[in-house]
Amino acid sequence: MEQTYQYAWIIPFLPLPVPMLIGLGLLLFPTATKSLRRMWAFQSVLLLSIVMIFSMNLSIQQINSSSVYQYVWSWIINNDFSLEFGYLIDPLTSIMSILITTVGIMVLIYSDNYMSHDHGYLRFFAYMSFFSTSMLGLVTSSNLIQIYIFWELVGMCSYLLIGFWFTRPVAAKACQKAFVTNRVGDFGLLLGILGFYWITGSFEFRDLFQIFNNLISNNEVNFLFVTLCAVLLFAGAIAKSAQFPLHVWLPDAMEGPTPISALIHAATMVAAGIFLVARLMPLFIVIPHIMNFISLIGIITVFLGATLALAQKDIKRGLAYSTMSQLGYMMLALGMGSYRSALFHLITHAYSKALLFLGSGSVIHSMETLVGYCPKKSQNMVLMGGLTKHVPITKNSFLLGTLSLCGIPPLACFWSKDEILNDSWLYSPIFAIIAWSTAGLTAFYMCRIYLLTFEGHLNVHFQNYSGKRNTPLYSISLWGKEGSKISNKNFRLVTLLKMKKNGRPSFFSNKVYKMDENVRNLIQPFLSIPNFGNTKTSLYPYESDNTMLFPILILILFTLFVGFLGIPFNQDVDILSKWLTPSINLLHKNSNNSIDWYEFCKDAVFSVSIASFGIFIAFFLYKPVYSSFQNLDLINSFVKIGPKRIFSDKIKKAIYDWSYNRGYIDAFDGTFLTVGMRKLAEFTHFFDRRIIDGIPNGVGLMSFFVAEVIKSVGGGRISSYLFFYFSYVSIFLLIYYFLNY
């Protein structure tokens, strides 16, 4: 076992040859490298598979022995300062390594087909392999200096992949936004690292935690300064994991290719922030104020992410806000001290979210056959619907991922989210109410995404579709969608969402209608599809190739069974608790993972009931338009005009505006922060040029003019210069004399 640990340093470096060889190949043999470009996908998958096998071997050894291994090389600069580089293998490292490699392999296999048409195929795989190297280096780091180095490399790879299609202005802007937002957090992280080094004199985790605990127990530190340094460290995690208020980059990051969205949201970029807080938990747990602050940021992000996901029309942005909310749950759990629950949810969410993103990529891929390559159209749920019969495998996989994220048993996220929800009652009833309510919102918006994408009819085939924003069909609102006009005058249909001219939503039309015939028999799709600039379009979408479906099917298995790793029914079968034994013993010395069956069933029934209610509301608001009901008296009974109806419409409109406009946070940033920074820059530029530079320039200019005047008066004679010189000296002496008299 010791010998296995000794070679663990190679984990981050195994995927590194791929980007290096691609770069050398493009530099020395560009034609041959491009002609054999599909070969690099196999090499990337092979090397990452070796890392996965090695990581699993380490994990099995840790489960059996509950050990932590650390190896350090010291680089002594002088007697007072030395840099230490090494690697740390503990349960957190092994969990993250398996997560990164398994999801990474699935994404690489998927990308081989998804990116096959792209001219940047080689560049994409070079970035992806370097991304894996950076993230693996981050999770195996043994000190804060290494953490920061790989932290920046992870960010750099994310920026490169977000702006992968850099010729598109929207993608370039999204890349810049991600970079600038994360600069704020990264600068805070750097200051926090330097602050704790100033306090403890060490960057190594084992020394840092021990020295800091001794200082705290002896009351030898300034708690205000310590809290400030901890907040600065946490700022890095806030930006990386898209927590409020530095979350604004995450939805715009969807401008990158869909496979990288899956990797970023499941196991790399956003998971890095959760990993950092989990790694530094021994540091944070002895500072009560910072733990409260972490949980506060987490619960705000939980609710904010869920509300912002309610009205998104872009399928990837809806999933992005879902990720933001679920990361909030993890951060809430860490702030509450529920280390096991947070990591459990990190695992289950990673596979479920990877499944959803790869499923959305399959949908987008199939929609491009209809609308051509245009992300605004191919990712727009307004133009989707009715995909069930065209992409059945993608539909079923997406449904499983949706139900998992909703918290429906026995799927993965049910087990982990339920633990966090139950722990929240013990921490704060207010936080618990918000967390449980958000569970219902999660079920609603995820079911909404599923229904808009797969149920009903294919909206791109509807009559009068032009792709313009002001058309009624384009403007699908928060709560439902609008059907095409039917030429049959006897046709009656309840319009669940009647869009007004200004695009504002209302739930129901102002009239009560009666359905005389079967909707599915009456609505006929119109196949007149406009030309979107891609000549290779077809009338209907089709299922993706097997290369793209294989990773989706594997992720279905993870979504079905990975949750059973952490079911605490029996200590002997609770693999996750055995896995995390060293960390749990460090953080929670008196922890007891035994579970009360009655309490578990009671809480599970309550959580499933809330999720089911959210799903029911989503079906109620969306499904009836496409159902085969002969009589809609139940729905018509809700359609009544009155003061209550008007008031409810105003509430719905406010919710829609809040959600669709991203909580006005981007508008606030653009109006106040961006404009304020520009005005501050203009003021500093004016102050620097006119005041700072103006004073010495003015003195020099004045001296020049005085010299010119004296030169003209003196006439070039030395006697005149001497006369004026002594005259001025006499005048200054007289002035000095009278002032001091």
Curated annotation (Swiss-Prot):
Keyword Ubl conjugation set for record: no
Catalysis performed (reactions): a plastoquinone + NADH + (n+1) H(+)(in) = a plastoquinol + NAD(+) + n H(+)(out); a plastoquinone + NADPH + (n+1) H(+)(in) = a plastoquinol + NADP(+) + n H(+)(out)
Highest taxon of source: Eukaryota
EC code: 7.1.1.-
Enzyme class, broadest EC rank: translocase
Sample GO molecular function, one term: quinone binding
Function: NDH shuttles electrons from NAD(P)H:plastoquinone, via FMN and iron-sulfur (Fe-S) centers, to quinones in the photosynthetic chain and possibly in a chloroplast respiratory chain. The immediate electron acceptor for the enzyme in this species is believed to be plastoquinone. Couples the redox reaction to proton translocation, and thus conserves the redox energy in a proton gradient.
Protein name per Swiss-Prot or TrEMBL: NAD(P)H-quinone oxidoreductase subunit 5, chloroplastic
Species of the source: Athroisma gracile
Upper classification of the organism: Eukaryota, Viridiplantae, Streptophyta, Embryophyta, Tracheophyta
Gene: ndhF
